[in-house]
UniProtKB/Swiss-Prot annotation:
Pfam family for this entry, one: Herpes_UL73
Subunit structure: Interacts (via N-terminus) with gM (via N-terminus). The gM-gN heterodimer forms the gCII complex.
Virion surface side: 25-56
Organism: Equine herpesvirus 2 (strain 86/87) (EHV-2)
UniProt cross-references to InterPro entries, sorted A to Z: Herpes_glycoprotein_N_domain, HSV_GN
Function as written in the Swiss-Prot or TrEMBL entry: Envelope glycoprotein necessary for proper maturation of gM and modulation of its membrane fusion activity. Also plays a critical role in virion morphogenesis.
Family: Belongs to the herpesviridae glycoprotein N family.
GO CC list: host cell Golgi apparatus; host cell membrane; membrane; viral envelope; virion membrane
Highest taxon above the source species: Viruses
HAMAP family linked: HSV_GN
Protein's name in the database: Envelope glycoprotein N
Topology in the lipid bilayer: Single-pass type I membrane protein
Length: 89
């Protein structure tokens, strides 16, 4: 048996020893805070997103980071093109 195979087997045995089963005490899920969100009457025109929710803040932060990254990249590319054009003439 290869030396690495024994270590892998030992790790697998340790992980399999700690496997347990989780038993739920309730059979139902908690009710939604917004029960009309999944109804057919709710669409983009009638559903108002909350600007203070975590997902909205996270999305706006991602948009800001991507915008800054694109601006930095475009400035870098334009500067390199400008320098290359100036040195060729």
């Amino acid at each position: 048996m290869a030396p690495g195979r024994g270590v892998l087997l030992l790790i697998c045995l340790c992980l399999m020893d700690n496997v347990s089963q989780v038993v739920c005490s309730q059979n139902s899920t908690t009710p939604s805070k917004f029960p009309t969100f999944y109804s057919y009457d709710c669409n983009a025109d009638t559903y108002a997103p909350q600007l203070t929710s975590f997902s909205t803040i996270w999305t706006l932060l991602n948009v800001l980071v991507m915008t800054i990254a694109c601006v930095i990249y475009l400035i870098y590319m334009c500067f390199n093109k400008f320098v290359a054009t100036m040195t060729n003439t």
